[in-house]
């Protein structure tokens, strides 16, 4: 079993950092690198690319809205064309920096409010995916399973890789419990270990209501801003390996056998 472990990386500006990116890069197999709008700057982006290259980690763009004060979690009013431009601009910036270091951007993982806006509008989602396809038809789209983003990626001719979020609670419909709701964020190590083991062995997760639902995923995400994120990511990786799995970058997970 090949499975990816990913985290959002380079989420800072100047000397400010969200997490220990150096430590996290030694654990994950794919890095979603902030591209300068909600977080990130050219120096940080370049450092993340170099770290990923040193550790054999796949590189992905993590575009967000230009909401620095709200860390990209506040929705903003943009037309569909404007939003497509924001996405392409950020991916393009990371692609250029990566190419300059002899690396390639392989995937896209939308950040917070940007992802929420795209994922509730079929027409907008398709426009965004078509814009990404024009930029690079080999790009992989990270999404949750059975979502507008996953369907739009497929319709646009892009490959997608589905996620299980180790540090976020799900409701009975398989949706993420909104941040700010009690129990939405899961940072207790034993709980994360149990959730990941259940997903790996049974393909299910216990919802916040106490029900069991199926989860279809090829990658496990740990948010870098979750308290103890590095330790949680290490737990995720150890559970995969204990189950006989191989942790490998997204492009290798979905590559033809």
Swiss-Prot record:
Record function comment: Catalyzes the cleavage of 5-oxoproline to form L-glutamate coupled to the hydrolysis of ATP to ADP and inorganic phosphate.
GO terms classed as biological process: carbohydrate metabolic process
Claim: ATP-binding is one of the keywords in the record: yes
Cysteine disulfide links: none
Record's protein name: 5-oxoprolinase subunit A
Subunit structure: Forms a complex composed of PxpA, PxpB and PxpC.
EC number: 3.5.2.9
UniProt keyword Acyltransferase, yes or no: no
Catalytic reactions on record: 5-oxo-L-proline + ATP + 2 H2O = L-glutamate + ADP + phosphate + H(+)
Family: Belongs to the LamB/PxpA family.
EC class: hydrolase
UniProt keyword terms in alphabetical order: ATP-binding, Hydrolase, Nucleotide-binding
GO function term, MF aspect, one: 5-oxoprolinase (ATP-hydrolyzing) activity
InterPro entries in UniProt: Glyco_hydro/deAcase_b/a-brl (IPR011330), LamB/YcsF/PxpA-like (IPR005501)
Stored NCBIfam families: PRK05406.1-3 (NF003814), PRK05406.1-5 (NF003816)
Gene3D superfamilies listed in its UniProt record: Glycoside hydrolase/deacetylase
Pfam families per record: LamB_YcsF (PF03746)
């Amino acid at each position: 079993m090949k499975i990816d472990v990913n985290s959002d990386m380079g989420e800072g500006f100047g000397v400010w950092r969200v997490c220990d990116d150096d430590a996290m890069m030694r654990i994950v197999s794919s890095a979603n690198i902030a591209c300068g709008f909600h977080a990130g700057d050219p120096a940080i982006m370049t450092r993340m690319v170099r770290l990923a290259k040193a550790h054999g980690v796949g590189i992905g763009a993590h575009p967000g809205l230009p909401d620095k004060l709200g860390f990209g979690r506040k929705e903003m009013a943009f037309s569909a064309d404007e939003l497509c431009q924001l996405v392409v601009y950020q991916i393009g910036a990371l692609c250029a920096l990566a190419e300059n270091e002899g690396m390639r951007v392989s995937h896209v993982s939308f950040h917070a409010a940007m992802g929420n806006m795209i994922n509730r509008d079929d027409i907008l989602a398709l426009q965004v995916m078509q814009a990404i396809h024009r930029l690079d038809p080999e790009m992989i789209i990270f999404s949750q399973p059975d979502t507008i983003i996953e369907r739009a990626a497929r319709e646009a001719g892009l490959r997608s890789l589905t996620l299980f979020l180790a540090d976020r609670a799900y409701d009975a419909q398989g949706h993420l419990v909104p941040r700010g709701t009690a129990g939405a964020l899961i940072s207790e190590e034993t709980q994360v270990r149990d959730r990941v083991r259940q997903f790996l062995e049974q393909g299910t997760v216990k919802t916040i209501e106490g029900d069991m639902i199926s989860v279809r995923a090829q990658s496990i995400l740990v948010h870098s801003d979750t308290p103890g994120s590095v330790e949680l990511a290490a737990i995720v990786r150890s559970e995969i390996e204990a189950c006989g799995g191989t942790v490998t970058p997204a492009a290798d997970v979905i590559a033809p056998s």
